[in-house]
Amino acid sequence: MRDVHVHFLHGYCGGYTQEFFEGFITAAQRVGLDEIYLLEHTHHFREFESIYAPIIAYNDYQHDWIKRNMDGSIEDYLTFIDTVKENTYPIKVKFGLEVCYIPETADKLADILAEYDFDFLTGSVHWIDGWGFDHPKQKEIWRSMDVNKVYRRYYDIMCDLCESGLFTGLAHPDSIKCFGCTPAYDLTDSYHKLALLLCKYGMYAENSGGLRLNYDPKLELGMNRQLLDVFRQNGVTIYTASDAHKQIDTGANIRELERMLNEVTG
């Protein structure tokens, strides 16, 4: 089993240490994982500040949130990776980034990413035309939005993400359901278009437990069944992902997420 989305969070702001890293190995072995993908989010690194210009400008909350979280340098992360890779471990470990895809700054993003060589790059959509739709403190903004338009824009951005050719994988492909808002139209065409692009660009998609783990334990686990079925019909590679933001959550829900995939193919 593998967990392809485990946040390192630079030692929970305590710095990059071998001891803290090995805690992830222990946590992964405890739940029977064979492989983990450790990553950092681009909003933690000052080198990526320019891609967040539309986010920072959207409102005061997002300005303050980005400025507060962008507290590190990617160079420290790269040095840490080089050090850790000098040793061997009982499970496979890959290192990468979760990268916010923001269409308005996609060219800048491509230039920045070209400077680095990671094992993987996971693309994610957390912002729709500047708005952080999945931030709990901005949940009320949904009330003023046309849900159908938001969903269409979300999947348009996700398709652009794939067509950028920058990414190895796609994070939580239906995280837009985080607050229970659903569109009035059939998403089948959007799902098929996304599936075809994932295959065309050789990307995997996550079957993610992140919403249940990080938002509400009552939320649906993993992709909705319709999306999962469409991905399977089109031959999309799907990997299980916890979206753990705490070391102890490494591998959370992975067995159940894996069973979902087996049920679809069985």
Regions found by a protein language model. Give the residues of each.
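Active-site-proximal loop/helix segment associated with metal-binding centers of metalloenzymes
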Residues: W127-F167
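Active-site glycine- and acidic-residue-rich loops that bind
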Residues: V93-D107, R143-D156, K177-D189, K218
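Charged catalytic cores and adjacent phosphate/nucleic-acid-binding surfaces used
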Residues: M1-G11, E47, S144, D160, ...
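Non-cysteine beta-strand/loop elements that form the S-adenosyl-L-methionine
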Residues: I36-L39, F118-D129, T168-A171, E206
